[in-house]
């Protein structure tokens, strides 16, 4: 099954079941036979929280989760959701002959779904979601003629083929939710013709086959994360009713049919992660009720559809994601008329021209991602009108000009990524006011000047990259002052003097891998943004931006002198350290002091003395480069060198002793360099290649020593 890389969409809409008969103020006594069945059930299960300790006596009012019929006392409804109950289901439940609603969701029940459930002939609602049931749908379900809702979602080992009779056994069936299970095969044809069906959710299974048109007025259709193929049907029968259509992460191909414009009630359309291509027809006019449109990760080409804004003025589009396609041309000015827009993602296309100057008219905008295009011009000053902005990502374009001091008006900003452009000038001091910043990437530009201590006001900073610019001056004493920092990349600049050790004793690069120790449970560089869509109160947009990288420091390719601060090797959570291509002196600290170290590059410096201890001591060490220094003495392969061929090349006074070659202490020469010369990947790029090999599959590429692949996902949930 195709795995979700970037965006995942979950829809939870409940179709209200018919009201059960209400008990009168004087509740009846529980039917003796039903009482006996329930007591047997209670004894058979594990009730760790003693949630069913109220099950005693004769009055229905005392029994947790029960609703009884007046005057018979027969059990009509049993709701035991979220009580942490476990064990297999005892067949005594099947003796509740009048039961109309059974909800055992959010527990730890296991085993097969009891086949005796088929004897509950009055059952209208069955919810067994979020348990550990296995096997397949019992054939006895064919007897449940009154069933209106069946929810079996999130039972990962429940599956098999959906029975061919499933759409025929109950003419009243309105809601079917088999999401996040293991169902396989094609959709049974009977489901396509079940006239009463309004909600069908089969997300995250392994279902196959082509999609055919449904013949009923569906309201919600969610077939995401399966293996459906073929082209997209028109859903003619659902034109007056279909509100949510999610077929993301399948293998659909072809163009986007113009008939989608006839779905006048459509509010959520997600066709991301498929194989759609061609241009989007200019005749296609989306529903004026559209709130969310996600066509990302396809092969669409041509110009961006401009008619979206002509039909979305009443309620307004909240999310527009057309990223990862082949759209070209300018960004249409009409997009700046989508007044309710909160997330705009047009990244990874072929867009040209300027960022629209009127983008600041989108005052509700919280996420802008225009990265990986060919946009030109400067960052429009009008963008400060997006005063609710949380993420501004415009990296990998051809933008120029300077960083506007007025950007300090975006005081809610958490993510600022303008890397890989042609932006020049200095960092405005006014940006120190952006105290919510967590990720700042301004690498690979033409920025210059000295760094000002004012940026230490970014107290929430997790990731800071100034790499590949023209910054100069001494490294500031406050370099390690950020309390929450995980990654610092100042590589390929013109910084000089010493590596400061101020604040190193108080800084503890956080342990984000296990969630234990002194760190936090969240992964490194993760920023979560939750957006409430005011236009539809039930919607919540969760935008997550991950720097899938490790904890580390990169100060390579600068003009640094002096010794490596001892305190730097006391940062026990550091995984990557790159100080190569500088003028550092002194001895190599013991690597045992960095137990989590995975990559270390100290090459092309002037480090000296003997290499003491086992250089492969950190168990996770994968890359080591100590070449082109001034180390001396004798080292054997037993001390860990065999794991890193070429790691000590270019140290003429160092002799590496192998089983076939012994060192003469009186005659150490430079022959070792020739032995390893062809095995060494030289320069700072060596550690980058390591990172690239580990993380090349991630969405946004690699950022320096930290292997910073960027992934993002956002979830638009429709809650009951």
Swiss-Prot record:
Which residue ranges are assigned to the Cytoplasmic compartment in the record's topology?
A: 708-720
GO terms in the biological process aspect are:
maintenance of root meristem identity; meristem development; phloem development; regulation of cell differentiation; regulation of meristem growth
Query: Which residue intervals make up region (C-cap/acidic domain)?
Result: 649-682
Impact after mutating residue 178 to L: In strain: cv. Bu-0, cv. Co-1, cv. El-0, cv. Gr-3, cv. Ita-0, cv. Jl-3, cv. Kas-1, cv. Landsberg erecta, cv. Lu-1, cv. Pi-0
Glycosylation-annotated residues = 49, 62, 84, 108, 127, 168, 206, 270, 361, 398, 446, 505, 578, 614, 625
Q: Altering residue 572 to R: what's the impact?
A: In strain: cv. Landsberg erecta
Q: Which residues lie on this side of the membrane: Extracellular?
A: 26-686
Topology within the bilayer: Single-pass type I membrane protein
Q: Where are the LRR repeats?
A: 96-122, 124-144, 146-168, 170-194, 195-217, 219-238, 239-263, 264-287, 288-311, 314-338, 339-362, 364-386, 388-410, 411-436, 438-458, 459-482, 484-506, 547-571, 573-594, 595-617, 619-641
Entry's Pfam families? Answer: LRR_1, LRR_8
Identify the stretch(es) annotated as N-cap: 26-92
Any idea what job this protein has? Involved in the perception of CLV3 and CLV3-like (CLE) peptides, that act as extracellular signals regulating meristems maintenance. Required for the sensing of the root CLE peptides (e.g. CLE8, CLE9/CLE10, CLE11, CLE13, CLE14, CLE16, CLE17, CLE18, CLE20, CLE21, CLE25, CLE26, CLE40, CLE41/CLE44 and CLE45), which also involves CRN and leads to root growth regulation, mostly in the phloem and protophloem. Involved in controlling the stem cell population size in shoot and root apical meristems, and during organ development. Promotes the formation of CLV1 multimers.
Q: State the similarity comment.
A: Belongs to the RLP family.
Supply the name of the protein.
Receptor-like protein CLAVATA2
Q: Which gene encodes it?
A: CLV2
